[in-house]
């Protein structure tokens, strides 16, 4: 089952944890299982995650569609991800934010995260979606997300996805700073990138519709 779940809580710190789980290692959700409200000021640091199924880090799925809840000021730093194995494409992503149930997810920081050669899945999955199995509505947005000093060494990563829902429910203001894949820093001005390529192509990221202001810098 899941590891460290946060439902409708504020001012939470996980420091120095090791999670090996047969589902999500750590999650942040809004209203869920009798707990009501959004989430603010959640930090996980100096920790190690191993997901035999589903996500190492997962944010945003559950909430109260009538309340338009917010999950904000979430920080993940100095983390080792040892494994990720998920056959279902909808539930892949080492670093995953999937906004559902009219949730807004904003001000998220992933920093100094080392990802090993996991078995099956995606590096990043940012989506606003309507998953009818678990949600009653799509999310409202994902915005202001920083990925800083993220490294991945391996050859099992499938195509990552960054996709909004419509012009009112967008993924926006996403910054990758010193994203390093197999020793190569992915940046908008990187050497060897054909002029007609998107920078995201160099990382094997699919950037779909309703995504705004995504940058890759050294």
Regions of interest found by a model, annotated:
Residues 1-218:
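Extracellular/periplasmic carbohydrate-active domains that bind, remodel
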């Amino acid at each position: 089952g899941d590891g460290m779940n946060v439902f409708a809580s504020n001012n939470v710190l996980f420091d120095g944890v090791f999670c090996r789980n047969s589902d999500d290692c750590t999650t942040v959700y809004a209203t869920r299982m009798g707990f009501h409200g959004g989430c603010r000021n959640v930090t996980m640091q100096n920790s190690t995650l191993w997901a035999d199924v589903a996500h190492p880090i997962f944010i945003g799925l559950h909430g109260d569609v009538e309340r338009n809840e917010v999950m904000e000021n979430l920080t993940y730093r100095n983390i080792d991800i040892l494994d990720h194995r998920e056959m279902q494409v909808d539930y892949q992503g080492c670093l995953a934010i999937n906004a559902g149930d009219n949730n807004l997810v904003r001000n998220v920081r992933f920093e100094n995260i080392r990802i090993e050669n996991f078995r099956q899945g995606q590096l990043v999955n940012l989506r606003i979606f309507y998953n009818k199995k678990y949600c009653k509505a799509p999310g409202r947005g994902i915005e202001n997300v920083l990925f800083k000093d993220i490294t991945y060494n391996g050859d099992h990563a499938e195509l990552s996805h960054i996709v909004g829902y419509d012009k009112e429910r967008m993924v926006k203001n996403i910054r990758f700073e010193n994203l390093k894949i197999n020793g190569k820093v992915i940046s908008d001005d990187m050497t060897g990138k054909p002029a007609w390529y998107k920078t995201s192509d160099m990382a094997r990221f699919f950037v779909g519709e309703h995504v705004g202001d995504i940058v890759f810098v050294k």
